[in-house]
């Protein structure tokens, strides 16, 4: 692990109860780390995981990194104060989104496991940036291997049985999303975020009862 400190942090106002996963969305890992360490950027993350699995530590866990922005999850409106932010090097949808290499996923999995164990974080609170800011963000995206985390009990699995309830409605679905944790002020954005994570092969924003 490499220590590369960012000046962009503050004091937490909430205990750590979440992990928020991002992709860097820049053309290289070095560019992303430079940006996160730049005072002018006003953004940061606790950790960056490069494509070769190298782990970079940028903000101490007890401090509030600036990674989630305007966000909401399960009643928390200051996700930065409640979370550990992990940036995963990937060009993202703007610069050539691609699968996450095995070495990178191995490091992400080990890091998440350690943080879950250290802070007693519930798997429901291991989330993506798109989960907490669905109207603004789409990372870590549909190629991220959530199933790898879920198999280890580090994140929530997608239900294995699909039910189409004759009494199902858009309002029922959005209410279920809200109970799960999503902010539903923008219902379609929340639906897309849910699909991106749990039905990544068909992200159409349609509420179809699946």
Each language-model region and where it sits:
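Active-site-adjacent loop/helix surface patches within enzyme catalytic domains
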Residues: 1-124
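Basic/polar, cationic surfaces and motifs that engage anionic cell-wall
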Residues: 77, 92, 97-185, 189-210
